[in-house]
């Protein structure tokens, strides 16, 4: 039977690329989304048509424990337990510090960190019982260095996700491997549509390979980390940023 992969925030961007790549490799896929319903269902249809694996789409706010409980109940009834968890769901409410309020700060942490906590807690028992599990947390180079102003809540959440990775790896060893990927500037829909051409040009100049990353390149790294070939990789943060230069 195929291993089951849950990707939070899996309908667009990096999450979509991961869903497509792992579906191509023969994994059964669960696409979690919150608002991107059309994109999620279109992605599901593509995966089933092209790769012949089982695929579910489930709307759930991963920051809410009750909705995560319902999501996992549905997964277990349809596919069984989750063998591989990709904590990818994230929001970015960028603003200057003096214009930001505590509710915005809290919301970012709730989705980006508490969401990963909630999903990791739900997969733990199944993974432990079968003596196998893989958890990949999608952080950011912003969780390691500060590259931009106005990102205090996002950066703090991504740094917390790195810390969560290390703590879970210690507690979940030896059977459950927990690793973290820290992408730099990746050419997702949000990134390319959200900035003007001049800003994108300036960002590329800060990258040693002189281009921004493709979501597929993050997906290729995920594919490796969940494979048997990566069995000796655990409790690790891997940057995928083309050699990002400088920080604030």
Protein language model regions, located:
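Residue(s) in the substrate-gating loop at a strand-loop-helix junction
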Residues: 140
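Substrate-binding pocket helix/loop in short-chain dehydrogenase/reductase
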Residues: 96-109, 135, 191, 199, ...
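Active-site helix of classical SDR
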Residues: 120, 157, 165
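A conserved structural motif in NAD(P)-dependent oxidoreductases
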Residues: 207-218, 229
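Alpha-helical segment proximal to the catalytic Tyr-Lys
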Residues: 125, 166-174, 231
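Short C-terminal tail/terminal secondary-structure segment
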Residues: 145, 223, 234-248
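Conserved glycine-rich cofactor-binding loop
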Residues: 11-12
């Amino acid at each position: 039977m195929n291993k089951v992969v849950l990707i939070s925030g899996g309908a667009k961007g990096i999450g979509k690329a991961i869903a497509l790549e792992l579906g191509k490799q023969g994994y059964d896929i669960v696409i979690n989304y919150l608002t991107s319903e059309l994109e999620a269902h279109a992605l599901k249809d593509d995966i089933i048509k092209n790769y012949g694996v089982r695929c579910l789409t489930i709307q759930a706010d991963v920051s809410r424990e009750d909705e995560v409980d319902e999501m996992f109940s549905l997964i277990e009834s349809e596919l069984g337990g989750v063998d591989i968890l990709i904590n990818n769901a994230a929001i970015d409410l960028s603003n200057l510090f003096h214009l930001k309020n505590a509710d915005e700060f809290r919301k970012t942490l709730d989705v980006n960190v508490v969401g990963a906590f909630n999903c990791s807690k739900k997969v733990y028992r199944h993974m432990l019982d079968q003596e196998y599990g893989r958890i990949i947390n999608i952080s950011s180079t912003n969780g390691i260095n500060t590259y931009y102003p106005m990102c205090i809540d996002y950066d703090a959440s991504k740094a917390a996700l790195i810390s969560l990775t290390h703590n879970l790896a210690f507690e979940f060893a030896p059977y459950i491997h927990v690793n973290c990927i820290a992408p730099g500037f990746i050419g997702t829909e949000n990134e390319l549509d959200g900035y003007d051409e001049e800003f994108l040009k300036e960002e590329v100049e800060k990258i040693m390979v002189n281009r921004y990353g493709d979501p597929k390149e993050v997906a290729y790294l995920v594919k490796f980390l969940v494979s048997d070939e990566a069995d000796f990789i655990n409790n690790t943060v891997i940057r995928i940023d083309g050699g990002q230069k400088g920080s604030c």
